[in-house]
From Swiss-Prot:
GO cellular component: cytoplasm
Keyword set includes Transmembrane helix: no
Record flagged with keyword Transcription regulation: no
Family: Belongs to the MurCDEF family.
Protein's job: Cell wall formation. Catalyzes the addition of glutamate to the nucleotide precursor UDP-N-acetylmuramoyl-L-alanine (UMA).
Organism per entry: Lactobacillus delbrueckii subsp. bulgaricus (strain ATCC 11842 / DSM 20081 / BCRC 10696 / JCM 1002 / NBRC 13953 / NCIMB 11778 / NCTC 12712 / WDCM 00102 / Lb 14)
Protein name per the record: UDP-N-acetylmuramoylalanine--D-glutamate ligase
Pfam families noted in UniProt: Mur_ligase_C, Mur_ligase_M, MurD-like_N
BP GO terms, sorted: cell division; cell wall organization; peptidoglycan biosynthetic process; regulation of cell shape
Length: 460
């Protein structure tokens, strides 16, 4: 941890006692701040709340007391990224002119390790995992490590406080929720894997707001830093060029004009062959793009082709992201629970040459699924739909001419139905194309239940 004066003696309100709220509170205490922690949940029996209280934090649970802002002056409000800006405490802080920031900004300002940041609508977690493993392979030769932190599930504050040294590297996954609250971060390399519409518009309200939040990943970089941009998304690229002072390098699915691109047999950096495509374990063109971005970041940070090959030739996928689960009677089963939108489902469905039995459905966020019709025609032999969107997805399947359509209420029924439809040589793909919140708390929980239900079938 780097000693900084920015938060020393400051009166700070931390909003939300999740894992990141707990971690950033401990970090801020170490940096000399005076803390109040507030959560709408009852914290009377919460062990984390008790631990913070024992360390001198004023803990207020069970409500959002907006009158706190009338009683005293706060220097900062550090909010859980998932809490909307319409929250009464956040709105009151804004009204009072209190700077509103999130955990990543606090943690990265105190990091003595250099860091790189990755964001995007789809693919950022896989890209972060690949980058972390490549860089760890490289740094271990020197006795140091790369740490995957941020939206991937490990708060940056935890690693900054307890693990990372000056010669380590933080590989940070950042969501648009986290980036919206950022006012000053400077990654050595920033990357935006892709940006699609219809993602988190319930939070950001407009697509422009969503893009602006994503652009914060490179907005505060210097000319000596690097920014990796998607050459194939020209409208976004034009905005990226205006948003960052860093040197922009591009990557492309197939255009050799880009700095990094997918060639016929190799992932390329200019004329240099970086990795043989046939040796990459991850399925799908989108994972070749994720691999390309990881190669770009890692090579800029010093890793060599031996480090890249060691990881890409063995890495089989992140949990819930086209995760291979098992083979049931000749049917390969994949868990793509992270597919919370149409774009993510599209890349998953396109990833296989075998006939697919698709299991999809979830929360109805107003998506129109007609864009999947042509994809269904080419790849899907049968479909099982469940959840709030079950009839909407079934309607898209009918338009595609799919003859076998099964509509069920929940995921458990869906797994059983899909397994009966799949034959040896098929792929059973769980790629919901929807958020999980109609029946599950998170996409991770949904994916865990999918795997559990599949394993139950395997044991019969």
């Amino acid at each position: 941890m780097k000693e900084i004066d920015k938060y020393a003696g400051k009166n700070i309100l931390v909003l939300g006692l999740g894992r990141s709220g707990f971690a950033v509170s401990k970090l801020l205490l170490k940096l000399g701040a005076r803390l109040t922690l507030n959560d709408k949940a009852d914290l009377a029996a919460d062990p984390k709340a008790k631990q913070l209280a024992d360390l001198g934090v004023r803990v207020i649970g069970g409500s959002h007391p907006v009158d706190l802002f009338d009683q005293e002056k706060f220097d900062y409000l550090v909010k859980n990224p998932g809490i909307p800006y319409e929250n009464p405490m956040v709105a009151k802080a804004s009204e009072k002119g209190v700077p509103i920031i999130t955990e990543p900004e606090v943690a990265l300002s105190a990091s003595e390790s250099p860091y790189v940041c990755v964001t995007g609508s789809n693919g950022k977690t896989t890209t972060v995992m690949l980058t972390q493993q490549i860089m760890d392979h490289y740094l271990q030769k020197q006795g140091h490590h790369a740490h995957a932190v941020g939206n991937i599930g490990c708060p940056i504050s935890e690693v900054v406080l307890n693990q990372a040294g000056p010669d380590d590297l933080l590989v940070v996954e950042m969501s648009s929720f986290q980036l919206m609250g950022v006012t000053d971060i400077e990654p050595k390399v920033a990357a935006i894997v892709d940006i699609y519409n219809n993602v988190h518009l319930d939070y950001h309200k407009t697509f422009d707001n969503y893009v602006d939040a994503k652009l914060n990943v490179g907005r505060f970089q210097k000319a000596s830093d690097y920014f990796l941009a998607n050459f194939d998304q020209k409208d976004i690229l034009a905005r990226e060029e205006k948003a960052t002072k860093a040197k922009i390098l591009t990557f492309s699915e197939n255009d050799p004009v880009a700095d990094f691109y997918i060639g016929q047999d190799y992932l390329m950096h200019g004329e240099e062959k970086m990795m043989k495509i046939a040796d990459i374990k991850l399925p799908g063109i989108h994972n070749l793009q994720n691999s390309l971005v990881a190669i770009g970041i890692s090579s800029l940070m010093g890793a060599g082709k031996d480090d890249i090959a060691a990881v890409l030739s063995t890495f089989t996928g992140a949990e819930h992201r086209l995760q291979y689960v098992t083979t049931l009677d000749g049917v390969k089963v994949y868990n793509d629970s992270k597919s919370t939108n149409i774009e993510a489902a599209t890349v998953a469905i396109q990833s296989f040459k075998q006939p697919e039995v698709l299991l999809a459905g979830g929360l109805d966020r107003g998506f129109v699924f007609d864009s999947l019709v042509d994809l269904f025609k080419k790849h899907v032999k049968a479909i099982v739909t469940y959840g709030e969107t079950r009839y909407l997805l079934a309607d898209a399947a009918r338009k595609a001419g799919i003859k076998t359509i099964v509509v069920v209420d929940n995921l458990h029924e869906g797994v059983k139905a899909a397994s009966k439809l799949a034959e040896a040589g098929d792929v059973l793909l769980f790629s919901p194309a929807c958020a999980s919140w109609d029946q599950f708390k998170t996409f991770e929980e949904r994916g865990e239940y999918f795997v559990k239900y599949v394993k139950e079938l395997e044991e019969k």
